[in-house]
A protein has these predicted regions:
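TPR/TPR-like (Sel1-like) alpha-helical repeat modules
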Residues: 99-115
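Hydrophobic/aromatic side-chain positions at a characteristic register within alpha-helices
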Residues: 59, 94-95
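Conserved small-residue packing positions in alpha-helical repeats and bundles
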Residues: 55, 89-91
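Hydrophobic h-region of N-terminal signal peptides that target proteins for export
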Residues: 10-19
């Protein structure tokens, strides 16, 4: 539980250590990140997107209707959509003001990658770029999306549950590809075990915040770091 609490406090304090005066708080309204060679955005606008050819141009258009078209393409055929694509969609959604959608697609991408990396042996050189890119997205985009997500703890829990259910309901087909070595003799069973662990972690979070003291302490920590002022609408 100590480790879990530490992770939550990191989410409360994320992105608060930039050089700012104590009196002036910068509102974080965009996810300005660079993850070569997949994605770059500055001041809320994409500089380039190279994650999934069917939607790259739509994401570059930088408007809500185009983003929704991109999401529809993913929803219609999600089986081989890479986690980096889902987290890029999350970044675009955040920049365009669809922040709850951003939370969902970020967690969906994060959990899809976790499921992949838990079943497939990603320690080899062939996965170096994949691991680095996903780690970068989870860290850089997460430093913005997580603090926003916890503006409403109850809503965050609902979205996390939906994201886990989405990953369970849409197994990433790459997990079952013979091209990729697995640490498990039964990949379906291994994937099921990963999903069960994600659900168990989700339940631990619910139990943690069901304790009024834990919730109050967490809210106080966010207030200390002025996280709500930076991230909440």
């Amino acid at each position: 539980m100590k480790k879990f609490r530490s992770l939550l406090l990191c989410a409360a304090a994320a992105a608060t250590l930039s050089a700012q005066s104590e009196d002036k708080v910068e509102k974080i309204t965009s996810i300005d990140i660079y993850v070569s060679p997949f994605y770059s955005a500055k001041e809320g606008k994409p500089e380039y997107v190279h994650v999934y050819e069917p939607i790259d141009d739509l994401l570059m258009k930088n408007d809500v209707p185009s983003l929704k078209k991109a999401i529809k393409i993913i929803e219609d055929a999600p089986d081989m959509v890479a986690p980096t694509t889902l987290m890029t969609v999350a970044a675009r959604a955040y920049d365009l003001g669809l922040k709850d959608d951003a939370v969902f697609w970020f967690y969906a991408g994060k959990y899809r990658f976790i499921s992949f990396a838990s079943v497939i042996d990603v320690s080899g050189a062939m996965f170096m770029e994949t691991v680095e890119a996903n780690s970068a997205f989870m860290h850089l985009a997460g430093d913005v999306i997580n603090p926003y997500a916890f503006c409403d703890i109850d809503k965050q829990q609902i979205i996390v549950e939906k994201a886990v259910d989405w990953v369970k309901g849409h197994p990433y087909k790459a997990i079952f590809s013979d091209k990729f070595p697995s640490m498990a003799s039964d990949r379906k069973a291994a994937l099921k075990e990963v999903i069960e662990k994600l659900k168990a972690d989700q339940q631990k979070q619910k139990q943690y915040f069901a304790d009024p003291k834990n919730r109050a302490d967490y809210i106080a920590e966010r207030k200390k770091y002025r996280t709500d002022e930076r991230f909440c609408d």
